[in-house]
Amino acid sequence: PPNEEWIIEAENHIRPSKHNHDGYSGKGYIETSTSLNSNITFEVEVPTSGTYYIDIRYANGNGPINTENKCAIRTLFTNGRPTGPIVMPQRGKDEWSNWGYSNPVMSVLHAGKNTISIIYIKPQDENMNGETNMALIDFIRLRKGNQRPLIRLFPPIIFPKND
């Protein structure tokens, strides 16, 4: 079917967080910050090659939704290649049980095993707050696209070489 969906529970791949918040799926969730779980890799298997939309179900209670600039920003990689930014804005001060979805990133996956990585890269993933860049990740969601979109939402990321 054209609207297939896969859920990859984060806590099945990385030790779950010890926080005690409600509303998550599965058996828990993981914390990601600039120093904790800043490079997360999952292996996924899909039956057919094609376009997939990848997003993250997350919670971010670091501040109010309209100020403080404490969103968590990461770079999504698929099969070792940068695919686009993942943005997880704060959902309200101390709203750690308020779960929502990040922006979706379009990626081409091949039939069989693929790797998906969520990585904090400095300076490109720094937010305007400069200190707080953290979220709780419940799961990664893959949705099969039924056709290749005419407009690509995010251009490819080009990283400068460090000599």
Tell where the protein language model's regions lie, with residue ranges:
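Extracytoplasmic
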Residues: 1-163
